[in-house]
Amino acid sequence: MEGNSGFRKELVSRLLHLHFRDCKTKVSGDALQLMAEFLRIFVLEAAVRGVWQAQAEDLDVVEVDQLEKVLPQLLLDF
């Protein structure tokens, strides 16, 4: 991540290109910046919801189980 600003554009580009059917598909700099911001917000929201779920279960540590419980609703919200 670039400081606190989000994911590196190179990483976002690589993630996107892994799922493109045509290897010649290009992504503009603005689109990469937008996707990086989207991913930053998504990960932050997942972390916050994981904390809320852990607190609801009276746990001090967020584990994979809490993230798995909040993921379906998180995906629907995004």
Curated annotation (Swiss-Prot):
InterPro entries in the cross-refs: CENP-X
Where does this protein reside within or beyond the cell? Nucleus; Chromosome, Centromere; Chromosome, Centromere, Kinetochore
Query: A GO BP term, please?
Result: replication fork processing
| Domain of life assignment | Eukaryota
Q: What GO terms are given for molecular function? A: DNA binding
Q: Residue positions of the PTM N-acetylmethionine?
A: M1
- GO CC annotations, alphabetized: FANCM-MHF complex; Fanconi anaemia nuclear complex; inner kinetochore; nucleus
State a single Pfam family of this protein.
Answer: CENP-X
Induction data = By retinoic acid.
Does Ribonucleoprotein appear among the keywords?
A: no
Keywords on record: Acetylation, Cell cycle, Cell division, Centromere, Chromosome, DNA damage, DNA repair, DNA-binding, Kinetochore, Mitosis, Nucleus
What is the documented function of this protein? DNA-binding component of the Fanconi anemia (FA) core complex. Required for the normal activation of the FA pathway, leading to monoubiquitination of the FANCI-FANCD2 complex in response to DNA damage, cellular resistance to DNA cross-linking drugs, and prevention of chromosomal breakage. In complex with CENPS (MHF heterodimer), crucial cofactor for FANCM in both binding and ATP-dependent remodeling of DNA. Stabilizes FANCM. In complex with CENPS and FANCM (but not other FANC proteins), rapidly recruited to blocked forks and promotes gene conversion at blocked replication forks.
Q: How does it assemble?
A: Heterodimer with CENPX, sometimes called MHF; this interaction stabilizes both partners. MHF heterodimers can assemble to form tetrameric structures. MHF also coassemble with CENPT-CENPW heterodimers at centromeres to form the tetrameric CENP-T-W-S-X complex. Forms a discrete complex with FANCM and CENPX, called FANCM-MHF; this interaction, probably mediated by direct binding between CENPS and FANCM, leads to synergistic activation of double-stranded DNA binding and strongly stimulates FANCM-mediated DNA remodeling.
What protein family is recorded? Belongs to the CENP-X/MHF2 family.
Q: Which PANTHER family match?
A: CENTROMERE PROTEIN X
What this protein is called in its record is Centromere protein X
